[in-house]
């Protein structure tokens, strides 16, 4: 009786072992993950370039540069007068 039960169990176990590992059903493919990462990097690069161009074209850098130049000139004049 034991032999009759052991043989089918052994056949099922051997078939499972010889079948190999089951493919992961929910695991994403590595190449698709890399493609998504590349797309994200390109999007981020485009947005960063757009922001930098917007900053370059705005008046803020020019005003800041002028303010620093004017302040530096005033400090320089005060140091010349005191010296």
From Swiss-Prot:
User: Which UniProt key words apply to this protein?
Assistant: Lipid transport, Secreted, Signal, Transport
* Additional note from the record: Apolipoprotein C-I is present in acidic (APOC1A) and basic (APOC1B) forms in P.paniscus, P.abelii and P.troglodytes and perhaps also in baboons and macaques. The two genes for ApoC-I arose through a duplication process that occurred after the divergence of New World monkeys from the human lineage. In human, the acidic form has become a pseudogene sometime between the divergence of bonobos and chimpanzees from the human lineage and the appearance of the Denisovans. Pseudogenization resulted when the codon for the penultimate amino acid in the signal sequence was changed to a stop codon.
Q: What is its main location?
A: secreted
Q: Which gene encodes it?
A: APOC1B
Classification lineage: Eukaryota, Metazoa, Chordata, Craniata, Vertebrata
Would you indicate the residue range of the signal peptide? Answer: 1-26
Pfam (any one): ApoC-I
Q: What does this protein do?
A: Inhibitor of lipoprotein binding to the low density lipoprotein (LDL) receptor, LDL receptor-related protein, and very low density lipoprotein (VLDL) receptor. Associates with high density lipoproteins (HDL) and the triacylglycerol-rich lipoproteins in the plasma and makes up about 10% of the protein of the VLDL and 2% of that of HDL. Appears to interfere directly with fatty acid uptake and is also the major plasma inhibitor of cholesteryl ester transfer protein (CETP). Binds free fatty acids and reduces their intracellular esterification.
Q: What is this protein called?
A: Apolipoprotein C-I, basic form
